[in-house]
Each structure stands twice: as structure tokens, then as C-alpha cells.
């Protein structure tokens, strides 16, 4: 199939710039004929006793670092305890061995790669990288979230290749994205546990603790796996032949207990509902002859129409970009024609798209 087969017209005003007033107050589109538009807090009406919801419990880290001099980096993947890959903007301003100081902590540019990718090393004093990021980093909101507030950046003093940053913050001269305290809460699922994602597994953002408690009370099970979402999730497909596209790799983990719960539910004929495309990709990557295997691994699975699914019966997901690998995935899962028609309906109904947008519940075709 061609990349253009997965294109559709999306009005820019439907790209959600902020979360809904409450997590569960977003809209939910049930993919039946005709589609049913409801509120997310009604999701329990479309599930039944014995269903198994599989969640991604990865926690978003504050992966965006302002280096001063109008330079930002977004961490991508952990390479070792102190070394990470990242994307820099603008990368042309950075050089190998540049050093950036945050109080008595240091970030060093160790390598420059193609397409703005770099490698960095953290030299920190008695704190972990995650503790450092919690203090100095920002939530890595997607690039399509563009707000009209002024950004802030730390005051920077440069001596040679060394830049010193302190906690006196001044506004950027330009306008663009900004993070708010609300984003620190709302761009994180309520059940997130394991730090490592640089983008949110967004289907889970709609769940509240109250909804999770109600699902449990109705006999609807829940279990958790981990996929650390990388920055590559936002990379566009640039080849017209979609099979020439190279997927990014991401770290996944399924515990023996989770694998046992999923396999038991499948054997008993219970419905498996994947909460998010990250969960579905992890399940399908781990599955062999219909059996989900426990373990930790990296996946670059690319799911397109024609893929034979072995795990989930239903998929809860947000609305995705035209021509994206995730729109290809849902076309594979719930039908190419059906998804184009469903998205036309969603656009007509002015549903909100992407990370802070609305959700849809799909059945496997």
C-alpha cells in the first residue's frame, strides 16, 4: 500500500492544545454501525464482566532540557545509566564536547548524528538522571501543541564550550509551546509507575482512579505491561512505499504474572482490550503462536493492513495523524475502509485529535 492511502483532511482546529476539563470528560467514539458518541466516563457501559484491560504503566519523564542560547534537547532513549540519545533543536548550534552546567551537574554532548539526533552524557553529583530531570527538565509536550504563551528558559553564561545555567528563568523572545503545572499532571496516566517514556501513552490519560475502581467492582480485570515511548513515535513516514519505512525501536517489558493473566483470559475466551497502541504493539511483539511471552526486549514492530493479530480483541486509542504509522495500525486492526469512514465521522462531529484529544474504542475486524 502507498502512504497516500492513509491520508485524510484534518482541520487544524481539531488538534487538541489542552486536555479536557477532567480526564474522563473527553469524548469517546464507539466504533459500531452507526458510531456512538458518548463521554469517556461511560466506557463501563461498553465493557462486560470478565473483560481484561491491558495498560502500559510507563511513566513520562521530564525529558525536555533547555540548554540556554535558545537550544533545547529532548531525550529519546536510555543507552546506559549516564548516556542517552536525544534530539536537539537547533542541532547546528551544538558541538561534540560542549558542556552545559546545571548548578554542580554537567551534561556533555558526546556525539552528533543525522537528523538532529545527538548523544549526551550526564555527570551528576549524588543524584540519578531521573532525579536531575525532575528538577531541571520539562514535560516533553508534542510539537503539534502550540500555545500562545511565552516560553521560559534558564539564564545562561557561556565560557568557551562550557555553558552555565542557573535557576533564574527569563522568557523566550519568541512564542510557541509552553508547559504548565497542569501538564505535569495531565500528560501522565494515573497508574504510571516505571520511569522511561519521553511521550505519553495517551489512551490511558482518560482513566481516573474512580473509573478504575468502578471497572474492578464490575468484574473487569486489569493488568499492566511496560513500553517506554520514544521520541520516534512522532517521526513522519517519508517513503511512498510504506514498507520501506524504518521503525524506531522501543524498550518493552512483560512480567510473568502479566503474561499468565493474559494467557489465562485468552484460554477462557475472555475479551482482551489493549489500552493504547503501545500496549498492542508490545503484546503482538511478545506473542508466539497465540501465547504471550514474559520478558524484556526491544521492539520495532510495524503493523500495517494484512497483519495477523494474535492478542487483543479490542483497542482503546486516541485519534491519530494522517499518514502516520499509528493510523496504519488501526486500519490493520479495525479495517482500512472502516477507519477512514470513522475518522470522517469524528471530524464531522468536531472530535479532538492527538495526545490531548478524544478516544475511540475499536473492535478487531
UniProtKB/Swiss-Prot annotation:
Monomer. SUPFAM superfamilies: QueA-like. The lineage of its organism: Bacteria, Pseudomonadati, Pseudomonadota, Alphaproteobacteria, Rickettsiales. One of its GO terms (cellular component) is cytoplasm. This is S-adenosylmethionine:tRNA ribosyltransferase-isomerase. It is an enzyme of class 2 (transferase). Transfers and isomerizes the ribose moiety from AdoMet to the 7-aminomethyl group of 7-deazaguanine (preQ1-tRNA) to give epoxyqueuosine (oQ-tRNA). It comes from the Bacteria.
